[in-house]
Amino acid sequence: MIAAVDVRKTFGDVTALDGVSVAVPAGTVHGLLGHNGAGKTTLVNVLTTLFVPTAGSATVAGLDVVRDAAQVRRRIGVTGQFASVDEDLTGTQNLVLLGRLLGASRREASQRAAELLELFGLAEAADRPAQGYSGGMRRRLDLASGLVGRPDVVFLDEPTTGLDPESRLGMWDVVRTLVAGGTTVLLTTQYLDEADRLADTITVLSQGQVVAAGTAAELKSRVGRRTVSATLAAVNIGPALDTLRRAGLDPLQSGRTLTAPVESSRALAVVVRALDDAGIEADELGLHEPTLDDVYLTLTGARP
C-alpha cells in the first residue's frame, strides 16, 4: 500500500533523507521512529506529495507520488502534529465543510460528519465551536477531518504530541479502530511505547537514514536477550550466586539483586525452583524483555 525506494531529499546542502526505503502492507500500522530532525516528517511530506523527492521513488495505493500526485491526495488522509481545524466553526461545521469541498452533497457530508463525530466520541460536542474543545478533542476532530473522504491510507505525524495520557490512550483506540476497518496507517512518533503498542512494523530513522526495520519483537531481539532478576532478602548473596551458577545461569550482582541473561521465559521457573530448593528467600523475582528504549539507544546512541 505504501512503498518508498531509495528516497533522497535535499534542501541545498542539507540532506534530510538519504536513501530511505519503507514498505507498508495494506491494513497495517507502520511506525516511523526517530528523534527530532531524523527525517520522519520529511518522509511523510514526500509520501503525501508535499515534497518532490530529489531521488528515488515512492508509491501510495499503487500511485506514484510525483506523476499521480492529484490522485494520491484523493486516496489519503493526513493529520499533523498540531490540530488544524477552524476554531470558529462547530465540530459538525468543520467536517461538513470538508465534505462539501471534496464534492459530497450536503446530505452526504452531514451524514459522514455525524458518523465521524460518533466514532471519535465528539457527538455531544458536535454543535459547540471548536475553540471550546480541549487539546485532545481538537486532535480527534483533526483526525476525523482527515477521514471525511474515506481514505485508504492515513498519515499520522506525531498525533499525540502534547496530549495528556488519557487523550493519548483515546487516540490509540481510534487508530486500532481504523486498522480494524481496513485502513493503512503510517504513524510517526517519538514515543517508544506508542510504537510498541500500535505498530505492526517499525522503521527507525537517524540522520535521514534507516538504521533498523522490522517488528518490535525483531528489533528487540537485535539488542539483547531476556533477563531474570532476583532481589534477595538476605545481604549475603554468595550462596545464591553459587545456586544459580549450578542451575546453568551466569548471574551478575548489583547490591542484593542478581541478574542473568536467559533464552526462554521458562528460566524464571528454574530460578524459583533453584532458590527454593536451596532455602534462599527472594523479596522480588522478575523476567525482563528488551524494550524499544534499549533498541533506540543501541542503534542511535540517543533517546528520541
Where are each of the predicted segments found?
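Structured loop/turn residues at secondary-structure junctions
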Residues: A125, G135, A233-V235, E263, ...
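C-terminal coupling/interaction segments
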Residues: E263-P304
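ABC transporter nucleotide-binding domains
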Residues: I2-A4, K9-S206, A212
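ABC transporter nucleotide-binding domain
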Residues: M171-V262
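Short phosphate-engaging motifs
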Residues: A16, E194, N236-P239, A267, ...
